């Protein structure tokens, strides 16, 4: 679970679906 990334990505990908894209990048 990429919980560690939830600290930065939600700012740009708070939707979750887009967050997945940010996690890949």
From Swiss-Prot:
The modification Methionine amide is found at residue 25. One of its GO terms (biological process) is positive regulation of phospholipase C-activating G protein-coupled receptor signaling pathway. Stimulates the release of gastrin and other gastrointestinal hormones. PROSITE patterns: BOMBESIN. The keyword Secreted applies. Belongs to the bombesin/neuromedin-B/ranatensin family. Signal peptide: none annotated. Its main location: secreted. GO terms for cellular component: extracellular space; secretory granule lumen. InterPro entries: Bombesin. The keyword Acyltransferase does not apply. Keywords: Amidation, Cytoplasmic vesicle, Secreted. Pfam families: Bombesin. The lineage of its organism: Eukaryota, Metazoa, Chordata, Craniata, Vertebrata. It comes from the Eukaryota. This is Gastrin-releasing peptide. It comes from Scyliorhinus canicula (Small-spotted catshark). It is found in: Secreted; Cytoplasmic vesicle, Secretory vesicle lumen.
